[in-house]
């Protein structure tokens, strides 16, 4: 596997609730987060406080991001990462370009100045993204960004769908 570089996530400056309230925030996370999910939220809170790794980028992902950022004509490339219901295993990754004003107040945000890249992770999706590796495949069939998720109990062969 290609070498990885860490992606450290920080809270968007507009976020008003402290990270330790994440596990108790029923409005954001709903009642479906119990047991191991709450444990994962606690680990995430500790990681954000200690500025530890949330997600990693492989060399291939970094190369593709640099290429996409070069096409933005001086602006930083901003991608929104979220997890939605769907796909063949129940949950599906969504990675879409957005404008800076579309970053939501409770998103986890990371800037990669050397890549001219900003990653905005939806607050309700962060629990599923924790410890993932973002890779890029140049394969003709099923090429594109792929997620390697060590938390997934079921995975789709395409790398875009999973379950926990």
From Swiss-Prot:
SUPFAM superfamilies: HesB-like domain. It comes from Plasmodium vivax. It is found in: Plastid, Apicoplast. Keywords: 4Fe-4S, Apicoplast, Iron, Iron-sulfur, Metal-binding, Plastid. Homodimer. Pathway: Cofactor biosynthesis; iron-sulfur cluster biosynthesis. GO terms for biological process: iron-sulfur cluster assembly. This is Iron-sulfur cluster assembly protein SufA. Participates in the sulfur mobilization (SUF) pathway for iron-sulfur (Fe-S) cluster biogenesis. Involved in the pre-assembly of [4Fe-4S] clusters and their transfer to target proteins. It comes from the Eukaryota. Coiled coil: none annotated.
